[in-house]
């Protein structure tokens, strides 16, 4: 895509690869409102080797997440994708393994609802591991469900959310799980996330796929899986989506 919007991408590859910290899930029950909340802070063009997943004009690289035979039905206008409520999640036609992802998103400028009912969506790495998208600007909710959380597992290190309606960025380094020939897990998934240029997930090890109010075990999936975006029935917008495949 030649006419992408937004701030110039901050080069993250070496920095993210160097992150080796591990966060503890801690003693709190999942989605506990008593869990300490993160501190609130004030928070270009793709590389030549990137695969541009949204060209600003159509959804030719996307399909319905539930069926490869169904098209993606979200709205496209003014260089962005907007969730069309009740049409279902969308997924990339191309499959990806370990990767670097850049994606920009914005929740509705008009504030409606509270908690999880305000600008909710999600970015699913390998179709199963959710980075939460939410309007988390002056909007209390459980820590492991706010924007930039690994939903149901890790809160972000800080709340770097911008105001509703403003464009925000996620820059992600993803290393998916690995299994041996018998299907036994040999390497859990790890992820590093920058929200608006701020480190919020520091090479965390995931306990398994995302699920609501439970933590299911890993399943023996292929190394390469689609990237998916969530229809949570809110008109969240996405743009400037690109990915770089990393050596396994």
Across the structure, where does each feature detected by a protein language model lie?
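Bacterial N-terminal signal peptides that target proteins for export
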Residues: 1-10
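Carbohydrate-interacting regions of secretory-pathway proteins
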Residues: 21-248
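Residue-level micro-sites within transmembrane alpha helices that shape
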Residues: 6-7, 18, 131
